[in-house]
């Protein structure tokens, strides 16, 4: 039995939850935190986290 195979199909890739990198304010450890996850350092348990800055250039035009 020879079945034809389809090559034009598209695969559905569900969007991954956004993962952000944060720095702990107490110990300085890097933590990856996903959406709906508790904001707490995995090393020391501190709850104050700083979001990492972007690497790309951010420029604003003043008027």
Curated annotation (Swiss-Prot):
SUPFAM superfamilies associated with the record: RNA polymerase subunits (SSF63393)
One Gene Ontology term of the biological-process aspect is: transcription by RNA polymerase II
Q: Which domain of life is it from?
A: Eukaryota
Q: Where in the cell is it found?
A: Nucleus
Location, primary (coarse class): nucleus
MF (Gene Ontology): DNA binding; DNA-directed RNA polymerase activity; zinc ion binding
Q: Where does Zn(2+) bind?
A: 24, 27, 41, 44
One GO term describing the cellular component: RNA polymerase I complex
Is-annotated flag, keyword Kinase?
Answer: no
Question: Zn fingers (C4-type): where?
Answer: 24-44
InterPro entries (alphabetical): RNAP_P/RPABC4 (IPR006591), RPABC4 (IPR039747), RPABC4/Spt4 (IPR029040)
Q: Does the record carry Zinc-finger as a key word?
A: yes
Report the Gene3D superfamilies cross-referenced here: RNA polymerase ii, chain L (2.20.28.30)
Going by the UniProt record, its keywords in alphabetical order are: DNA-directed RNA polymerase, Metal-binding, Nucleus, Transcription, Zinc, Zinc-finger
Endpoints of the signal sequence: none
Q: What does this protein do?
A: DNA-dependent RNA polymerase catalyzes the transcription of DNA into RNA using the four ribonucleoside triphosphates as substrates. Common component of RNA polymerases I, II and III which synthesize ribosomal RNA precursors, mRNA precursors and many functional non-coding RNAs, and a small RNAs, such as 5S rRNA and tRNAs, respectively.
- Give the family per the record: Belongs to the archaeal Rpo12/eukaryotic RPC10 RNA polymerase subunit family.
Q: How does it assemble?
A: Component of the RNA polymerase I (Pol I), RNA polymerase II (Pol II) and RNA polymerase III (Pol III) complexes consisting of 14, 12 and 17 subunits, respectively.
Name of this protein: DNA-directed RNA polymerases I, II, and III subunit RPABC4
What's the source species for this entry? Answer: Schizosaccharomyces pombe (strain 972 / ATCC 24843)
